[in-house]
Amino acid sequence: MTITARPRETELLAAATRLFRERGFHATSMQDLAEALGMNRGSLYHYITSKDELLWSVLNRSFDLLDERVAPQLDADAPPLERLRSAIHEHLRVAADHADELSLIQIELRSLSPERRRQMIERRDAYEHRWRRAIADGIANGELRSVDVRLAGIGILSVCNWFTQWYRPNGELTVDEVADAFVGLFLGGMQPWGKAPETDR
């Protein structure tokens, strides 16, 4: 299945994303997917060859969203601290807009077949590398203290990725308020003593 899908394929991706998050990949059957779409199970195979292919398509779409919206913030021609601040905000906005898709990266990537899992791990690693590069650039130009780049990247992304598990749009905080708090906690903690990062507010 291609990511630029026809309407019926788009409906299938949406149904699979919802059911995989609600029930888990292994507990969701092809019959469940067919019933969610109001079609016969056999008709699903006009669009996909297997459930594994469907999960792969969903995860590919998740990484496409991050590459389209967050990667440009990290790769921008701007000071490293500004790149990181903007990327935290945009990652959380993507997570809020596409919570089901992004949560599946964390909980179902391991469910893919070995070759497809390898492909997704490569995409995940490439995305994480962008964050580490921005952190390293910040250390190099003096905006950030000399910290362990790998651990700093893991810390920021772990908290940003877990956001999909607890954030509620009708809760007390807006997405940008949460992002500002994360900027203060992480970027503030990595800056030279006595400095504080700017927020979007």
Role assignments for model-derived ranges:
Residues 83, 96-115, 165:
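Amphipathic alpha-helical segments used for helix-helix packing
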Residues 57, 71-100, 152-156:
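Hydrophobic alpha-helical connector segments
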Residues 90-93, 97, 129-140, 159, ...:
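C-terminal peripheral helix-coil segments that are non-catalytic and often amphipathic
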Residues 103-106, 147, 197-199:
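Short, hydrophobic secondary-structure boundary micro-motifs
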Residues 64-67, 115-140, 150-154, 177:
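Amphipathic alpha-helical packing segments from all-alpha helical-bundle domains
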